[in-house]
Amino acid sequence: MSKERTRCREKVLQLLFQKDLGQEVEVDFSDFSPQGQAFAYRLYDGALQYKDLADSIISRFSKNWKLERMGALERNILRLAIAEMFTFSDIPQAVTVNEAVELAKKYVSPEAGRFVNGILRNIVRNWEEVKSLKEGFVDVTPEN
């Protein structure tokens, strides 16, 4: 399942990236097993639900980097990882961070992997504060 989960993350990242660029997206995870589909749909829904909160967290914990200055892929990889941490408490944060770093290295560059790693490690180190931000978050996500 872990290799399939990696492929699910890649597919969700592609959808988030397209959506971030204002493109229409077709959400279809039918090429995955039933468990993979469930994981992918839940991850995608979580990424949409927590997008504004994730952006706030990224802005708070990325030293000297404004969200809008980040590349769209890096920004969406970070959003995806934060959503995964909130949505799947059974997945160790170290696994989520590693998967995000691998996505950044594969789709952007080794430097992007280090960038994503640094921000996510900072978020994980400050997880109690991050959870308190989540508790104060009001979901204003429009219904699709």
UniProtKB/Swiss-Prot annotation:
Tell me yes or no: is Calcium among this UniProt entry's keywords: no
The record ties this protein, via Gene3D superfamilies, to:
NusB-like
Q: Which GO terms describe its molecular function?
A: RNA binding
Does Transmembrane appear among the keywords? no
Which keywords belong to this entry? RNA-binding, Transcription, Transcription antitermination, Transcription regulation
One of the protein's GO biological processes: transcription antitermination
* Cellular compartments per GO CC: cytosol
HAMAP family, alphabetically?
Answer: NusB (MF_00073)
What is the similarity comment for this entry? Belongs to the NusB family.
Q: What does this protein do?
A: Involved in transcription antitermination. Required for transcription of ribosomal RNA (rRNA) genes. Binds specifically to the boxA antiterminator sequence of the ribosomal RNA (rrn) operons.
Name the UniProt record assigns to this protein: Transcription antitermination protein NusB
What organism does the UniProt record list as the source?
Dictyoglomus thermophilum (strain ATCC 35947 / DSM 3960 / H-6-12)
Source organism lineage? Bacteria, Pseudomonadati, Dictyoglomota, Dictyoglomia, Dictyoglomales
Q: Which gene encodes it?
A: nusB
